[in-house]
Regions:
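Active-site and NAD+-binding cores of ADP-ribose-processing enzymes
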Residues: 13-17, 21, 46, 118-261
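A structural signal for short, well-ordered beta-strand segments and their strand-loop junctions
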Residues: 41-43, 89-91, 116
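ADP-ribose/NAD+-binding catalytic cleft of ART/PARP-like enzymes
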Residues: 3-84, 243, 256-261
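Cytochrome P450 catalytic domain signature, combining two hallmark sequence patches
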Residues: 104-117
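Short acidic, S/G/P-rich loop/turn micro-motifs used as interaction or catalytic elements
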Residues: 48-50, 96-97, 124
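Extended catalytic/binding region for NAD+/ADP-ribose chemistry, centered on the ART fold
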Residues: 79-101
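A short acidic (Asp/Glu
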Residues: 52-55, 99-102, 127-129
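Extracellular interaction modules
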Residues: 1-3, 110
Length: 261
């Protein structure tokens, strides 16, 4: 029978399972891609400070449903990338990794909340060109300073009878986010089309009106290759870690507390 404390833990953190030191060693000894001498991948976590975990978000279905999340989850240009809704997100920077966990805990016990991410063999990774993926959409930055301002401009073109954004309330976020479902993405794309059509019909002025439809707009501003994102295997990932990066994978992996290695 499963230990009661482990059952409670897995209920609070679905997809993350505590493992023993012996189990961790067995997993580690069977890995072919990973070596302890490799450049480190790190994440700060707010768990219960167990030294070792296994992470598998394959069955996870809940995530905060922002507009950018919908695009990266469902647009065809991102189809080969790991699904962020089912991914663990981490970095190659110790300093940046600390921001993933509670600041007070990190200041009190910096090593107890900092974990090394150890991927299983044959994993694939999404690599952002900087430490915060939201700041990496260069064409948005050139035209709008930030991707959110692009969507604010779309809202300014809207017919007020419909809502362009499909974002959760703060209460929803605290309760675990909302399901990202394809119908939300379809609604988003349809509403972008409506915004462009409505703006043209009212002779509004906007650089967005040069696009014929939502797909063309998304492809121009959010194509991963054009914005410096990469999809890599583990060996190529390690060789591409030149600065601070945000990284994600939907493949299973191990977490080992930094002071245990």
């Amino acid at each position: 029978m499963k230990n009661y404390n482990n059952y409670i833990f897995e209920s609070l953190y679905p997809g993350i399972e505590k493992i023993s030191s012996q189990q961790f060693t067995e997993y580690l000894n069977n890995l072919k891609d990973f070596k302890l001498t490799d450049k480190g991948l790190f994440r700060g976590v707010e768990l219960d400070k167990n030294p070792f975990y296994i992470v598998n978000y394959t069955n996870r279905t809940r995530i905060i449903g922002s507009v950018l999340s919908l695009i990266m989850e469902f647009h065809k240009s991102w189809s080969e990338y790991p699904k962020r809704s089912k991914s663990i997100i981490f970095t190659n920077s110790l300093k940046s990794a600390k921001s993933y966990a509670d600041v007070d805990d990190i200041m009190k016990n910096p090593m107890e909340n900092l974990y090394r991410v150890i991927p299983f063999d044959d994993s694939k990774f999404g690599l952002a060109p900087d430490s915060n993926y939201k700041l990496c959409f260069s064409k948005c930055n050139e035209d709008f300073i930030h991707y959110q301002k692009l969507f604010y401009e779309l809202v300014s073109l809207c017919d007020s009878k419909y809502d362009l954004f499909i974002n959760p309330t703060w209460t929803t976020i605290k309760n675990g986010g909302i399901k990202i479902i394809k119908s939300n993405y379809t609604k988003l794309m349809n509403n972008i089309d409506k915004s462009l059509d409505y703006g043209r019909s009212k002779n509004k002025k906007s650089k967005l009106l040069r696009f014929n439809n939502a797909d063309e707009l998304i492809e121009y501003y959010f194509n991963p290759t054009d914005n410096g994102f990469k999809i890599l295997n583990y060996k190529d990932l390690i060789n591409n870690l030149t600065i601070k990066h945000e990284i994600w994978t939907d493949s299973p992996c191990l977490l080992a507390r930094y002071d245990e290695l």
